[in-house]
Amino acid sequence: MTKKQLLGLIIALFGISMFLQIIGIGDLLFWPLFFLIAGYFLKKYSRDWLGSVMYIFAAFLFLKNLFSITFNLFGYAFAAFLIYAGYRLIKGKPIFEPNEKQVNLNKKEHHEPPKDVKHPDMRSFFIGELQMMKQPFDLNDLNVSGFIGDIKIDLSKAMIPEGESTIVISGVIGNVDIYVPSDLEVAVSSAVFIGDINLIGSKKSGLSTKVYAASTDFSESKRRVKVSVSLFIGDVDVKYV
């Protein structure tokens, strides 16, 4: 979806909302539509589980407005999360792991798994923060997802192996700050629905913003890090130290 299409969609939604307000049923649809759109962008740019929770939350809000159910924001959000978590567990999948394409195991049952397969460090939180700033840490592929909260990572503290390491961060509301040592080659891509992005000097702000930036010798470097950040509301700041 282009920015012009997105802007047109938002204007149309506000127009529909005003019309529904005039005829007396505006509150029935505005917030459900808002969270429905939020779910769409989260599933497009981020993890499926966050988008799915938003879809369920939008359905709860619609039913609440339709049947005048007592509103409890935390209760609805937590119930939406539990429904999705239960669905994932019933399907035999981890709660926070993104859906992956199924592999035909029959064709590979006689083959041993590759010995050089990386096992990413998976971290997630509902409300809180993640800081990797003070203590040294080994950087295998890192995958972080959160609902509400800030994330701060200092790569000068990281023990980075040769080759390409990846960091994938996704969230709904919060800020992401990543500090990069001057001798490390990085490539960073970020998508934010509402907020500011500053990627090693490339800045952009506004609505449905995307930025990509890479250091000059990234592709030739023996030790490099690729970073991907997706947020619904928040700021992303990746800078050299």
Swiss-Prot record:
Keyword Transmembrane helix attributed: yes
Annotated knockout phenotype: Up-regulates expression of liaI which in turn induces the liaRS two-component regulatory system.
Domain of life: Bacteria
NCBIfam families linked: LiaF_C_term
Lineage: Bacteria, Bacillati, Bacillota, Bacilli, Bacillales
GO CC list: plasma membrane
UniProt-recorded name of the protein: Protein LiaF
Keyword Transmembrane: yes
Signals that turn on the gene: Induced, via the two-component regulatory system LiaS/LiaR, by antibiotics (vancomycin, bacitracin, nisin and ramoplanin), cationic antimicrobial peptides (human LL-37 and porcine PG-1), Triton X-100 and severe secretion stress.
Localization per record: Cell membrane
InterPro entries per UniProt: Cell_wall_LiaF (IPR016975), LiaF-like_C (IPR024425), LiaF_C (IPR047793), LiaF_TM (IPR054331)
Main localization (coarse): membrane
Membrane-traversing stretches: 6-26, 49-63, 66-86
UniProt membrane topology term: Multi-pass membrane protein
Keywords: Cell membrane, Membrane, Transmembrane, Transmembrane helix
